[in-house]
Amino acid sequence: YHALPCGLGSRDTLRLEKGYCLYGNDLSDETSPIEAGLSWIVKTKVKSNFVAKDIFVHQKESGVERKLMGFKLDSRRVPRNGYKIFNETGDQEIGFVTSGTQSPCLNIPIGMGYLQIDHAQAGNKIQIQMGKKNHPAEVTVLPFV
């Protein structure tokens, strides 16, 4: 097969380009599968009860306040976990980055993060705060490739 060894960085880039979540970054005990776009794995119409079932039923029926979305950057800087996300004008914090990398397939920096639901539409312009400067980005649907 001529396979070559690769490390965790390669795996992380591949999963991010595919839009797959990484527990500890994109998923945690502070987020729900519904917010992460994984509602298909939460079966709320079963008769048995399970931890957080009531919360998931409510989120499926009423919607969520934030949503995990992808974004593509217009700069060469790579977004990192915890960076703040602002609206297009940069005057309102609307979310945070969970994962980011340089995409070898797209040849641009990409990332995922949680956005307030009213800003979580593909095509929306946002800004990612990196250091003292904000960098323009565009919200996109997942997967990237």
Regions found by a protein language model. Give the residues of each.
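Conserved, structured C-terminal
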Residues: 1-145
